[in-house]
UniProtKB/Swiss-Prot annotation:
Mostly expressed in roots at low levels. It is found in: Vacuole. It comes from the Eukaryota. This is Berberine bridge enzyme-like D-1. One of its GO terms (cellular component) is vacuole. The gene is BBLD. Residues 81-257 form the FAD-binding PCMH-type domain. Residues 1-33 form the signal peptide. Pathway: Alkaloid biosynthesis; nicotine biosynthesis. GO terms for molecular function: FAD binding; oxidoreductase activity. Its EC number is 1.1.1.-. Glycans are attached at N50, N364, N378. SUPFAM superfamilies: FAD-binding/transporter-associated domain-like.
Length: 567
């Protein structure tokens, strides 16, 4: 009897191992040993030694998974069930970057480009079309060279915002840069999508302040602004990341900041009625404040308890000047907020970037060297959506939104003010189009942890259903025809390409269909700039080598007309 049980357990173990092996093998799209050996040999021949191959029975997997997971910021895409790259390449020079692209092309691999790994939908780390793919991770290409005399800096694509800010501050205490607040976001992708932040009402987006770039295209050419031509240079600034080539470096314009700036984060929790009245007044004030002022709101529903608070509201303010000036401006324009001197802190610009960062325990810290930290400790699962608002939302409309927000303790909504320089820059100046007429942008966010992800009562599906409900509820109150969205807050719910079109093997009709299919999300992200972006894509990447689920396809019918030329 015992022998039979033992044999049964051994058989069961073998079956489970076989199932596990079969499941794991499905995570990596089929690739022959010959093909795998080809790309490995190619990389070695080009002296690219820093790469890791998907582990097989002959290769240990720790280094591969450590490298893969290091930069995945949204844990939804680090799950075991997600497809894995065949190879992860970490180039350490522009020559190695060029060689990496050529080796991927030689092996017919899809290419995923990863700078900081903050892609909201995991497009820098995952591919879902079933083809073998490679991740080219730029983490070693993170240099920042600042030239104060010319008020410019060359920033490699793998540098983070925090590394960039820190390098600028070491060179000058009266210069800064306009980009986002999360220091671990990669510069390559952030600027490719626009890059909105605390200085944007004064100086525009990160992409508005790019004066040159170095782009590795699908043929392995390293192109500067002159070589790529003005149409491509226009497209890569705000036209989305991962679809034009690989940004080796941006040349950015340094921006003047005073030695003293003012920062504050003021909580204003309360009833839905109280918060809705504050938000209603905020939307009338924040877009019209001086260009030097940035005032945003974040809201969430508190965890259920005995405290009679329905909504947590938090106002984050930044002013290019002293706190005396900041308080005077706000008390005149927004007295309902009740800002006091004790709420505000004077600091340097670089200290303000730390103050507003998502790094732990920085509220009372002045150790700005922490901005150089690349690894983000507080990773989570999340899903996000975005909107733009052109006309003020009524108190009743805000109340309706807060009723939905109240349902989900893990839900958040962030309101970012526009106006200022964003109002004056033309929507055709670069590919990012959301300018005149926008009062503010909205980011909807739901965030959960591992314990929540495995909750039988409320799994990740429940969280995603909630944010979709929130988004649908807001439809009457936001932009329409099209309902605009911010490409850096990528949302695959807006639509995806059913297949990844390769024009060289497709008909003109199917290629044209792909362009119209992509228009569904393309016009939400890029408005009237979409067709111009299609032409730029056809010119720089006619074979659609750089692509993902929500990319911009080339127009096959015009391939001959747009055969690459910088003229």
């Amino acid at each position: 009897m015992k022998r039979n049980i033992s044999m049964f357990l051994q058989l069961l173990l073998i079956i489970l191992m076989m199932i596990s092996f079969l499941f794991t093998s499905l995570l990596v799209p089929s690739v022959s040993a010959t093909t795998l050996n080809t790309i490995s040999t190619c990389l070695i021949n080009y002296k690219v030694s820093n790469f890791s191959v998907y582990p097989t029975r002959n290769h240990a997997g720790n280094s591969y998974y450590n490298l893969l997971d290091f930069s995945i910021q949204n844990l939804r895409f680090a799950a075991c069930s997600k497809p894995k790259p065949t190879v992860i390449i970490v180039p350490e020079s522009k020559e190695q970057l060029v060689s990496s692209v050529l080796c991927c092309r030689q092996g017919s691999y899809e290419i995923r480009v990863r700078c900081g790994g903050h892609s909201y939908e995991g497009t820098s780390s995952v591919s879902f079309d079933g083809s073998p793919f490679v991740v080219i991770d730029l983490m070693k290409l993170d240099g920042v060279s600042v030239d104060v005399d010319s008020e410019t800096a060359w920033v490699q694509g793998g540098a983070t915002l925090g590394q960039t800010y820190y390098a600028i501050s070491r060179a000058s205490n009266v210069h800064g840069f306009s980009a986002g607040s999360c220091p671990t976001v990669g510069v390559g992708g952030h600027i490719s999508g626009g890059g909105y932040g605390f200085l944007s009402r004064k100086y525009g987006l990160a992409a508005d302040n790019v004066v040159d770039a170095l782009l590795v295209d699908a043929e392995g050419r390293l192109l500067d602004r002159k070589a790529m031509g003005e149409e491509i240079f226009w497209a890569i600034r705000g036209g989305g990341g991962g679809i034009w080539g690989i940004i080796y470096a941006w040349k950015i314009r340094l921006l003047k900041v005073p030695k003293t700036v003012t920062s504050f984060i003021i909580p204003r929790p309360g009833s839905k009625r109280y918060v809705s009245q504050l938000v209603h007044k905020w939307q009338l004030v924040a877009p019209k404040l001086e260009d030097e002022f940035y005032l945003s709101i974040s809201m969430s529903s508190p965890s259920k308890g005995n405290i009679p608070i329905e909504i947590n509201a938090q106002f984050s303010g930044f002013y290019l000047g002293t706190k005396t000036e900041a308080i005077s401006i706000l008390n005149e324009a927004f007295s309902e907020l009740g800002v006091l001197e004790g709420d505000c802190k004077e600091m340097s610009w670089i200290e303000s970037t730390l103050f507003f960062s998502e790094l732990d325990d920085v509220a009372n810290s002045s150790d700005v060297s922490r901005l150089k930290e690349r690894y983000f400790e507080n990773k989570s699962y999340f899903k996000a959506k975005s909107d733009y608002v052109k006309t003020p939302i009524s108190v009743g409309g805000i109340m309706t939104a807060l009723n939905v927000l109240e349902k989900e303790p893990n839900g958040h909504v962030i309101l970012d003010p526009y106006g200022g320089a964003m109002q004056r820059i033309s929507e055709e100046a670069i590919a990012f189009p959301h300018r005149k007429g926008n009062l503010f942008g909205i980011q909807y966010l739901v965030v959960w942890k591992e314990k929540d992800n495995n909750n039988i009562v409320k799994s990740n599906i429940g969280y995603i259903e909630w944010i979709r409900e929130f988004y649908n509820t807001m439809a009457p109150h936001v932009s329409s025809s099209p309902r605009a969205a911010y490409v850096n807050y990528m949302d695959l719910d807006l639509g995806v390409m059913d297949d990844y079109l390769l024009p060289c093997t497709s008909t003109t009709a199917s290629a044209n269909h792909a362009v119209e299919r992509a228009r569904v999300w393309g016009e939400k992200y890029f408005l009237n700039n979409y067709d111009r972006l299609v032409k730029a894509k056809t010119k720089i990447d006619p074979l659609n080598v750089f692509r993902h689920q929500q990319g911009i396809p080339p127009l096959f019918a015009s391939m001959q007309e747009y055969t690459y030329s910088s003229k």
